[in-house]
Amino acid sequence: MEGTFELGTVRCPSGVLVLIDGGHLGLWSGERSPADIDPVLLGIEDPDVAADVAGAVDFAVTGPDAATAVRTFGRQPGSRLHDIPASQAAGVQAAFEVHCGAAGLEARLEAVPGREAHAHRARRTAEEGGGGFLVFGVPVVAVGGVPRDRQLPVLAARVGHGEGAGERWSEISIRTGEGPVASSVPLGDIGVDWARVLFGDVDALSVWQHDEPVDGLADVAFWGAAADEAAALFAAPELGEAGEEGVRGWTGLPLPEALHRARALSRWKDGTGRRMAVDFRPHSPHWRIMREVRASQVGAGSVDLGEARVLCAMTGRGDGFFPVTAELDASGASSP
């Protein structure tokens, strides 16, 4: 079975659209330095490793051959090198010098004072024509020139994958114009670890709250082989959320109570070795958008942040690297 489905719409008042794994938005620094992000959010608990990451360096590439040098160096997408751990910075500089010397290129690395905020990376990348950059090692894509004054439909094409794998999205696209495609330009890859992609205005992402509840409330959900046993022990009802049949838990709890119940469930699960997933869900924009995703027949949801609308969609293919292409009409207008 083949078909095209509308997943929803996005609105991008800034004209700069970011494509990122929605599960990683807790790492997005917005207008702040990435050094302000707690290494614990990266899964780093060792204090020495945390200090190394917190002291990381961003490098700008300067010199007449800068563009060629950074591209052929091949360490990262984009025109800069980001998030180089402090212990590796000197080694990267030395390797770059060797590379330029061997290739006869005139370029050098210069440390960016205070690091480059993620929102600044996106805007600069868009100004340079669009493309990819890294956010703590995760590939992200930014594109500029997106219409600012209207909602843009997000479409997905579905095809049968074969061999019993069922139907999956073959592509997801945002239509910014109606002209015929004259050329295509690869922009880079999105790195996905949470099976979802988010399309968002760069300014809207700067006010995104990933885990902080906007109303002081949270949900606790659990499911799996031991869910019935846990529900009886903890007196948990059906969660009652659309698209989550068989999931147990509580909705709209005060944050301290929700944390207490989630931790109690996790301790019971881990202490007994039972098979069950426990999900703590603060009422944040991330919770709102994922609530829509879980209830959606097409695995997509959206949330308004100011004048912007951001959309999150499940990939239908799990995790991986997903290429992004700008299809241009004869005037050079794009449709990422």
Model-derived segments and spans:
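C-terminal structured interaction module
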Residues: 295-336
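Compact soluble domain cores
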Residues: 273-303
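Extended, low-hydrophobicity segments enriched in charged/polar residues
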Residues: 2-284
